[in-house]
Amino acid sequence: MTRAKYRCRHRLAAGWFGWVCALLATVAVGAPLHGIALHGQPKYGPNFEHFDYVNPNAPKGGEARFAAIGSFDTFNPFNIKGQPAAGIGQLFETLLIGSADEPFSEYGLIAESVEIPEDRSSVTFNLRPQAKFHDGTSITADDVLFSFEILKTKGTPLYRFYYANVAKVEKLGERQVKFTFAPGENRELPLIVGQMPVLSEKYWRDRDFAATTLEVPVGSGPYRIERFEPGRFIVYQRDENYWGKDLPVNRGRYNIDR
């Protein structure tokens, strides 16, 4: 082989190697995103201030009363036992939250940003440092890992089905969690995992998650339970100190006091 041919092949090999490295870097690392969509880009950009369908200056106050058929005997809506109280979901939050004016898009709630490689083989959530539970403790990666495991092992069968294609969950930092998916073509998996409610490990780890309970749970959402009487009523009160009240996804929402 002549020296010229060797140099040519060497340059081609070097160029090919560089292209492969660049491609792998693109697949392995995704820039942090404020929101994700199943196809294309989400409607709202990274600097949006509120959803279009809300009044960001809506006054706070007042009461709303709703009728519910039947009774309730538990404040744990995540297992198969008992009848959860209507509206109990207002106590809990998910990593991401959808908007009401577009399909298959989600934006950061507990998660401040999301990282997804081009092939959607994983999703990484970066949690907001200000995110807190009602008891004042910070929401961390440990809470996310705990929530995933307890929902999958002791929650309703829905969660086992939902998370069946999650191959691995890793804590990358105090506020960073990575979900790696099994091989396949399900582009919806990052959105599915983003809908996962985040529960307090401190509160739940020494309690029976599979049991019915009327002990008021620790959540992180915009409302707390003010008072209740089983079989008759439950009153939710807006949390004045709710950590997420000024987030773009929440601005103009949760205006009723009770």
Each PLM stretch: what is its role?
Residues 71, 91-104, 193-258:
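Gly/Pro-rich hinge or "lid" segments in bacterial periplasmic/extracellular proteins
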Residues 1-12:
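N-terminal secretory signal peptides that target proteins for export/translocation
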Residues 41-44, 53, 69-72, 80, ...:
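Solvent-exposed coil/turn segments that connect beta secondary-structure elements
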Residues 57-61, 114-120, 170-173, 216-217, ...:
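Extracellular/periplasmic catalytic domains that process cell-envelope and extracellular macromolecules
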Residues 31-119, 126, 149, 218:
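N-terminal lobe/hinge region of extracytoplasmic solute-binding protein
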Residues 126, 160-205, 220-229:
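Surface-exposed binding/hinge segments that line
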Residues 15-27:
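Bacterial N-terminal signal peptides
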